[in-house]
A protein has these predicted regions:
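Functional-site microenvironments in short loops/helix caps that host divalent-cation chemistry
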Residues: 1-126, 141
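Short, structured beta-strand segments at or near domain termini in extracellular proteins/domains
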Residues: 126-140
Length: 142
């Protein structure tokens, strides 16, 4: 089973991404990838949320293997629910690193594309994971 990695603090998530020559996305990159061009509250629009993510109502209080729900229009899976995801962004107002996406233990509202929470980077949670991002070199137009 390919369940999401969880229970890593922000530093451990950063180190893992660095080792594979990637990085944590910023919260804005994360939201852009999650929305996949949508402007609605949820990236799936008016479709049944149970087709798109694991949350309190359908998760049976646990994570699930990745990729079982429908992807967004960019083809990215699990951008809502299953586990919250660390980002590389920091909010001075809360003193914490930004976490996005909602998890299996939250209501559907946590899966809104714009929803965020924060945590101190030293904390580990059984409902927070991460995904790595890769910087793509820009191509100069000549």
């Amino acid at each position: 089973e390919q369940r999401p990695v969880e229970k890593l603090n922000w530093f451990e998530a950063m180190e893992y991404c660095r080792r594979i020559k990637k990085r944590l996305p910023t919260e804005w990159e994360w939201e852009w990838a999650a929305r996949a061009g949508s402007v609605s509250k949820f990236y799936w629009g008016e479709e049944d949320p149970e087709l798109h993510g694991w949350f309190k109502k359908n998760s049976e209080k646990k994570t699930h293997p990745v990729g079982l729900k429908l992807p967004n229009s960019f083809g990215i899976y699990d951008m809502g629910g299953n586990v919250w995801e660390w980002t590389n962004s920091y909010r001075e107002t809360t003193g914490g690193k930004v976490i996005r996406g909602g998890s299996w233990r939250n209501s559907i509202n946590a899966m809104q594309s714009s929803k965020w929470i924060t945590s101190l980077p030293i904390h580990r949670f059984h409902y927070v994971g991460f995904r790595c991002a890769k910087t793509v070199p820009s191509v100069a137009n000549n």
